[in-house]
Amino acid sequence: ATFVGCSATRQTQLNAAASQAQTYAANALSYLNSHTSSTTRYTTWFGTFVTSRYNTVLSHFSSISSNTFSSYTFDCTCSDSGTYAFVNPSNFGYVTLCGAFWNAPVAGTDSRGGTLIHESSHFTRNGGTDDHVYGQAGAQSLARSNPAQAIDNADSHEYFAENNPALA
């Protein structure tokens, strides 16, 4: 990885987060490839299963899993305590980390690894998701009310990938 304004400690933490994100992405893609009809895990985060929407999610995770997270550029110069991270969708592979990121666990709900999935889904080449809602409750509600937006929501991708608590 390339680091901008990151201490040695934070570089180590980012290497671990990148590794976790790579695992999450690979596992999400593997799951989608082996579950091509409705499952609790899919419908919880993306709503009613229809093939066209499934194919969109599959495309997103296929792209995300082909990223090498350890080759991203990580910028540690943001100190906003209320923000995890942000990207410019057209500037592929450049992620700015903020205060909330450093307080997150490496894996699990709202984790560092999951944050990198969230941010990578915003990159245009990975699907260009938006932020329609934040949080698990919001994402689950969106899946029920508007699956078309759920498949375009970054947190929905993060929670599907983190799969915590685990859903079949």
Swiss-Prot record:
Localization per record: Secreted
Principal EC category: hydrolase
Residues of the site described as Transition state stabilizer: Y134
Pfam families named among the record's database cross-references: Aspzincin_M35
UniProt key word Zinc: yes
Cofactor requirement: Zn(2+)
CC cofactor note: Binds 1 zinc ion per subunit.
Sample GO molecular function, one term: metalloendopeptidase activity
Name of the protein in question: Peptidyl-Lys metalloendopeptidase
Family: Belongs to the peptidase M35 family.
Record-annotated disulphide pairs: C6-C76, C78-C98
Cleavable signal peptide: none
EC number, as in UniProt: 3.4.24.20
Positions of the catalytic residues: E119
Keyword rRNA processing in annotation: no
GO-annotated cellular components: extracellular region
Protein's GO biological process: proteolysis
UniProt KW keywords: Disulfide bond, Hydrolase, Metal-binding, Metalloprotease, Protease, Secreted, Zinc
Listed InterPro entries: Fungal_M35_metalloproteases, Lys_MEP, M35_peptidyl-Lys, MetalloPept_cat_dom_sf
Annotated positions binding Zn(2+): H118, H122, D131
Regulation affecting activity: Inhibited by chelating agents such as EDTA and 1,10-phenanthroline.
Catalysed reaction, written as an equation: Preferential cleavage in proteins: -Xaa-|-Lys- (in which Xaa may be Pro)
